[in-house]
Amino acid sequence: MAAIINQRVEQGESSMGGAKPALLHRITGHVARINDVILLSKDEGVWTASDDRSVRLYLKRDNDQFWPSIHHFMPVAPTSLYYSEETYKLLVGLINGNVYEFSVADDFNSMTESRKWTCHAGPISGLGFALSSELIFSCSRDKSIVWHCSENSNKMGSYLLENSCTAMVIDLPFVFVGDHGGHVTVLRIVDNQPNLVSKLSAHTNAITSLTWDGNKKVLYSGSSDHLIIMWDIGGGRGEAYELNGHNGKVTTLCAAPAAKRLFSADEHGKLMCWDMNCKRVETPEWKTSDCCQKCNQPFFWNLQAMWQRKVVGLRQHHCRTCGSAVCGSCCDNWTTYPPMGYETKIRICNDCNARMKDNPQNFNLTPLAIPHEIHTGITAMHLQETLGLLVTSGQNRVIMIWDVRSVCSAPSGSQ
């Protein structure tokens, strides 16, 4: 029978205490999937882009309800938004590869088309604006990244990837682009020329979201493989830490640099808040072997050993904490191990199980994340950390605004 280590941990509070996101508002009225949302920081409003071709701005009224102040229809469905509150400029990326720029009125009652770029041959999957260099970036499913000058609309440069672009974040001179192959390409833009710095490869499925912590110089990537990876870009040592808490495709990520938090959401409606102020441990590489590295029993593909010993081959498993290739009998123990990113139970070998039991002081099993069920898949999310507000859009076409101040201000783990 499978053993469970430190069962009390499941009922215990996380390193951030018992804080939970609090629902403040629900916005209904959309008739199609919502592809992107942006929460304003200076006004109480939400931008949305939907498959019904609409771009809407909801503002909070005196009756505490949100109503559309702007309701603009695009030629085809918008897939991505970017809004600059400093310049009142709205960028809208479309499914046909076009990018529109709008000037938004000061009273938020109208928006006027300023420019249009026909720069891609596939759906826009990411937009960005670097105010300091006056560059507008866009990436697309057509595998390309393009940047234009925001002053004269001229194309300043481009870069072609091997796979379709799925997500992008910008912190010039660096541009991070996730693709359908599960890679993150790191570019350095010098005099509008792209230079390949690195390609980060650890995911086994498409990248779905990227977010950047500029304070710690850390990049977070979410993927269809249910995994989140924290890439320590600024550390210079190539360290990467896995975060395992989702049982479905991770759809969107939001970093809260000041609070040292990470918000993630998946296709099943699970919202996670991760404590990124604690010491984490890198996951080991999985070892390869033709026999169990504990009892030496052959695995089912090791025909020679099976024939010589006259035994039936066993199925291979891996201990998640040491990476050993083991049989089922040698790893029938299950536990969480938050320092390594495992917030749900994972399989460990008998040796690691014994070490955890004999030296519990060396294995802190306190949860380092707060899970919250929204009960509908999340399609988009945006955080305004200074306000302590988070907005999500669900597969049920409902927009929810959450108060996350208690989560962000809660005490967290040690460095």
Curated annotation (Swiss-Prot):
Can you name the source organism?
A: Caenorhabditis elegans
Signal peptide residue numbers:
none
Q: Where are the WD repeats?
A: 71-103, 119-148, 202-232, 245-284, 373-403
Q: Which GO terms describe its biological process?
A: endocytosis
Its recorded name reads WD repeat and FYVE domain-containing protein 2
Residue numbers binding Zn(2+) 1: C292, C295, C327, C330
- Record gene name: wdfy-2
Tell me which GO cellular component terms the UniProt record holds.
early endosome
Q: Where are the zinc fingers (FYVE-type)?
A: 286-357
> Tell me, what does this protein do in biology?
Plays a role in coelomocyte endocytosis.
Tell me the CDD domains matching this sequence.
Answer: FYVE_WDFY1_like
Alphabetized, the UniProt keywords read: Endocytosis, Metal-binding, Repeat, WD repeat, Zinc, Zinc-finger
Q: Name one GO molecular function term.
A: zinc ion binding
Q: Does the keyword Endoplasmic reticulum apply?
A: no
Q: Which residues bind Zn(2+) 2?
A: C319, C322, C349, C352
The entry summarizes the disruption phenotype as follows:
Worms exhibit disruption of coelomocyte endocytosis.
